[in-house]
Amino acid sequence: MNIGVWLSYDGTRYDGWQKQGNTDRTIQGKLEAVLEKLEGSTVEVHGSGRTDAGVHAEGQVANFHLAKSMDPDGIMRYMNRYLPEDIAVTRACVMQERFHSRLNAVRKTYRYQIETAPKKNVFERCYYYGLGQELDVGKMEQAAAILSLIHI
């Protein structure tokens, strides 16, 4: 059975989405470890995209196949019980067998946040880039005009 899950995570403590041989601090690795305990065998989790180290996600879709037939809500409760507190499954459902979260993705939204205050907010430092000065909107508009002419 093909299960789709919607995820939110604070990526501060992680080395990105993709499982890596030199670290167990990845989102994919944490998900697969929990699911392997549930399934009793290896489970490969496919994400709709890969985030870099320290990057957060809200509403990221992933999918995985289980040999056992299980209730999606039960899977979600199990995962949330055993995942670290900075990773949450917010929704789970049975998907069509051919569904693949990356190949069937229709949209991704990225949000970049810049803090322009001269002093950093220590409680939000992981969620903003601390520039420490006002943005020069005129220069940004000039750069955007140049970039709009470049075709890659």
Locate each region found by the language model.
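Structured-RNA-binding interfaces characteristic of tRNA pseudouridine synthases
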Residues: 1-151
